[in-house]
């Protein structure tokens, strides 16, 4: 396998086949479409609590299974083993990646579930009524 990093940093790992693509807003979608599995390891600290949600949703949107640290926002988006994977230890990272790398059918099923869940829970159609209700509530509260 090849590890593809889309980042603003330079990396070199002599132990593996690695390609680094500089992150650019203009090419982000086409770059994400080059991957088979989306990885989102984060540190378990206060700063990282709000991270992970958008990245996981981007993986879901381009149809790849996401694997994320079991921490923060990712815990609320990923249904472990259904639409992605949550991992906590180095061994869990290894086990889940091996499972996904070796099983194209599983990757396809997880990807399909992820896209379905994204559309069901986070698309414009899924959230528009919620936002309208919130805005109406604010407006009505302000009028009283």
Task: Identify what each model region corresponds to.
Residues 4-34:
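Nucleotide-activated donor-binding/catalytic signature segment of Leloir-type glycosyltransferases, i.e.
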Residues 99, 106-121, 127-133:
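A short, well-ordered alpha-helix in the C-terminal region of glycosyltransferases
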Residues 25-31, 38-58, 68-76:
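Nucleotide-sugar-dependent
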Residues 4, 67, 85:
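Conserved beta-strand positions in the Rossmann-like core of class I SAM-dependent methyltransferases
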Residues 8, 69, 89:
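Cofactor-binding loop segments of dinucleotide-utilizing enzymes, especially the Rossmann-like FAD-
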Residues 101-105, 134-143:
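Short, hydrophobic alpha-helical segments
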Residues 79-91, 99-105:
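Conserved acidic donor-binding segment of nucleotide-sugar-dependent glycosyltransferases
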Residues 37, 61-66, 82-83:
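Structural loop-to-beta junction motif characteristic of Rossmann-like glycosyltransferase folds
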């Amino acid at each position: 396998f090849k590890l593809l990093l889309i980042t603003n940093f330079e990396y070199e790992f002599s132990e593996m086949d690695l390609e680094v693509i500089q992150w650019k807003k203009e090419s982000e979608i086409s770059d994400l479409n080059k991957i088979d599995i989306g990885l989102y390891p984060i540190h378990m600290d206060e700063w990282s609590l709000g991270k992970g949600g958008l990245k996981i949703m981007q993986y879901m949107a381009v149809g790849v299974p996401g694997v994320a640290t079991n921490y923060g926002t990712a815990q609320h988006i990923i249904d472990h083993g259904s639409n992605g994977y949550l991992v906590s230890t180095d061994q869990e990272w290894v086990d889940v990646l091996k499972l996904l790398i070796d099983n194209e059918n599983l990757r396809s099923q997880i990807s399909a579930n992820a896209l379905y869940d994204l559309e069901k829970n986070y698309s414009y159609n899924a959230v528009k009524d919620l936002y309208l209700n919130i805005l109406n509530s604010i407006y009505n509260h302000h009028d009283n």
